[in-house]
Every structure is written in structure tokens, then in C-alpha cells.
């Protein structure tokens, strides 16, 4: 962490840099990655009554899995809640260190895990559902299987979990170890894709699967949270699946079968987004035809709503808004239409109300300094 770093107050002006951030000499977009507001699961528990009074019926939790980053899409352990979200990080790390992460029989419940299950129970008492967010497409470099791979190289039993392009040669002073990271990001090693029978092309559904060992580990984690003590009433209510289009449909069909075998009522929503960034959104139909997801994150509704309500250079009228929404609506099966995750904001997009004041064509130009 930067020198002098501290937790940022909740009401802090978003675009104002903290004193410690200024001292780093980094621009806002770089320094903000170090920002933390200090939230934890107890804080969510404390707000459940407030959320219930607002009429909230489901909580979509961004990744809670143990990970070093602020976003948690760089998993260190899929099967544990991040130790910093619970009451005893030191004790939890000792528990995790005592396990064999490859063997579910050795998995224990940390204090953070137990607090999360308490959150699930309390949410259920209030008629709320809990949806967990996972990225099965990649892990972080501190993920236990990847660390084993780095240490043992071609002798690692996990060498086929990832796309290794070259192993280190111990006879040379250089480190030749190289692997494929998600979208080239070396902090996010990608799980190996197998059994591809159609072209894998960004922004398009394709037929394929993932490495069997990684797949079975993912299934074990899935069952753990759906029925933590063998009783689905004490488990979560569904999953939001990150970068779903980067994984083949074969895996998702198998994943759906596993989920439904444990909890027939579980809700599955996939994140699909760009066919061609930043103008053409993906076709949701391959993912919402009854054998993959119940829904997708429906940015197809967010975009025309913004163009109608905001005063941008891409403004549309009421008829165009209606036509756009009906086009998307009519592409979906009747059972899926009311299940879509229609977003007014996400962790990847500005709040829709805030975005009404963004005069630019694209929502990612949300900084007022970018107004044209």
C-alpha cells in the first residue's frame, strides 16, 4: 500500500484524491485502485432492515471469494469468503493454510464463511435472496493451483489447468515461464479451454468446455455454497457468472445441470456484453434458450434508456425507445423476459441517473471533465 495509506471515508468526493494518493504521484484512475472504504459483511448485516424497508428482495454480491484486490475477480481461493470481510483475518488464514484446497473433504468454515452464512440466513428471514458473483474463466496469480504451477512447472499436477506457453528452463538464468492471461492480463491467468467445436471469437457464443480438473473444483465450490450443510434452505439462491461469453456453452450446460441437481430454484445470470466494443452489444439468445442461463445482464435495455433520458448527441425519441426495447424483448423466450437482470447501474457502469448528465455518446465518459 502507498505510504500513509488509510481507509477512505464513505462520503468522500469521488474525484478528489486523498493526501496519500496525491503523494503517489499517480493519476486518479491509477491511484483510485488503492482506495478502500472499509466495508465488511457485518456492515451488510447491519443494513438488512434498512434494505428490507426499501423493498429490496435480492442482494447481488460482487465477488466475495478470498482475493488480494479490491474487485476480487483475481481469486486466491474460490471456496472461502475473503478473510478481510470477516471478524478474524489472522485466524481465518491459519484455517485456510491447514487445508488441502484440492480436497473438499479438508475444507473448513472460516469466521468469514460463517458470517456470510449468517447473512444468508438473515436475508432469507426477510424474504431476500442472495446471489454470489464468480468468475470461472480465470483466477488470480495467488490462486493455490497457479502457485503450485509456478513452483513445480511441468511437474505440477495443475499444469493443464492453465494455458502455459512455455515452462521455465532451470539451466538458464532467465525465467522462461509464460502463460495466457485473460485479455492479456498477466495478473489473471486464464483457465484452459478444451473441446472446442466452433470458433472461439470474442463477443460470440461458442461450443467448448474447460479443463476437467478445474471444472470439478468449480463444481465442488458451487455445491458448497448452494447447500453448505446439505440443506439448500441454508444456501445461496443463485450465481452471477462473470465474462460468460469467454467460456464455452458446453461448460455452462454442465454447470446448470450441477446447480439444478442441488437447488432446482437457483437463479443463473450470465454477464455477456460486447460483440464489438463500444457500439454493438451481444446477442443474448444463445444464453437464454433454456439450457444455459435464466437471464443475462441486460445492458440492451440500459443503453436505449440512457439515450432517451439523457441529453446526448445520440438522443432518441419515444418511438425509437419503444422500438429498441420491443426488439430486444421479442428476441427472448417468454419465460426469460421477466427474468432479465435489467440494470440501472452496475460495478461496470455509472448509475443511470448520474449518466443522464453525461452529454457524451458513451457511458464510460462519465467524468464531468470529459464533457464535450
Model-derived segments and their meaning:
Residues 120-128, 137-138, 146-153, 220-223, ...:
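Active-site-proximal helices and loops of the catalytic beta/alpha 8
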Residues 14-38, 96-103, 182-209, 233-236, ...:
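Short glycine/proline-rich turn/loop motifs
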Residues 64, 148-258, 262, 273:
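Polysaccharide-binding and catalytic clefts of secreted carbohydrate-active enzymes
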Amino acid at each position: 500500500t502507498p505510504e500513509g495509506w488509510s481507509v477512505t471515508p464513505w462520503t468522500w468526493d469521488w474525484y478528489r484524491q486523498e493526501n496519500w494518493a496525491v503523494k503517489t504521484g499517480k493519476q486518479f484512475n491509477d491511484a483510485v485502485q488503492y482506495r478502500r472504504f472499509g466495508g465488511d459483511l457485518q456492515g451488510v448485516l447491519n443494513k438488512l432492515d434498512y434494505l428490507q424497508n426499501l423493498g429490496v428482495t435480492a442482494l447481488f454480491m460482487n465477488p466475495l471469494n478470498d482475493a488480494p484486490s479490491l474487485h476480487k475477480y483475481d481469486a486466491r481461493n474460490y471456496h472461502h469468503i475473503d478473510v478481510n470481510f470477516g471478524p478474524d483475518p489472522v485466524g481465518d488464514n491459519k484455517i485456510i493454510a491447514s487445508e488441502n484446497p484440492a480436497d473438499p473433504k479438508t475444507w473448513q468454515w472460516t469466521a468469514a464463511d460463517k458470517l456470510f452464512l449468517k447473512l444468508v440466513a438473515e436475508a432469507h428471514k426477510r424474504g431476500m435472496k442472495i446471489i454470489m458473483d464468480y468468475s470461472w474463466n480465470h483466477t488470480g496469480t495467488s490462486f493455490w493451483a497457479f502457485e503450485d504451477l509456478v513452483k513445480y512447472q511441468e511437474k505440477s499436477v495443475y499444469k493443464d489447468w492453465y494455458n502455459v506457453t512455455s515452462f521455465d528452463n532451470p539451466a538458464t538464468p532467465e525465467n522462461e515461464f509464460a502463460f495466457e492471461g485473460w485479455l492479456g492480463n498477466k495478473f489473471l491467468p486464464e483457465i484452459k479451454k478444451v473441446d472446442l467445436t466452433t470458433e472461439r471469437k470474442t463477443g460470440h457464443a461458442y461450443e467448448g468446455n474447460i479443463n476437467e480438473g478445474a471444472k470439478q473444483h468449480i463444481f465442488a465450490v458451487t455445491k458448497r455454497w448452494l447447500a453448505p450443510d446439505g440443506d439448500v434452505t441454508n444456501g445461496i439462491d443463485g450465481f452471477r457468472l462473470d465474462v460468460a461469453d469467454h467460456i464455452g456453452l458446453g461448460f455452462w450446460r454442465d454447470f446448470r445441470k450441477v446447480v439444478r441437481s442441488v437447488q432446482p430454484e437457483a437463479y443463473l445470470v450470465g454477464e455477456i456484453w460486447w460483440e464489438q466494443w463500444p457500439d454493438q452489444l451481444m446477442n443474448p439468445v444463445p444464453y437464454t434458450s433454456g439450457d444455459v442461463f435464466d437471464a443475462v445482464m441486460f445492458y440492451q435495455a440500459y443503453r436505449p434508456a440512457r439515450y432517451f433520458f439523457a441529453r446526448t448527441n445520440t438522443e432518441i425519441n419515444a418511438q425509437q425507445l419503444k422500438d429498441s426495447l420491443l426488439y430486444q424483448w421479442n428476441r427472448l423466450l417468454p419465460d426469460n423476459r421477466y427474468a432479465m437482470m435489467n440494470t440501472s447501474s452496475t460495478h461496470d457502469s455509472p448509475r443511470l441517473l448520474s449518466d443522464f448528465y453525461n452529454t457524451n455518446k458513451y457511458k464510460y465518459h462519465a467524468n464531468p471533465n470529459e464533457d464535450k
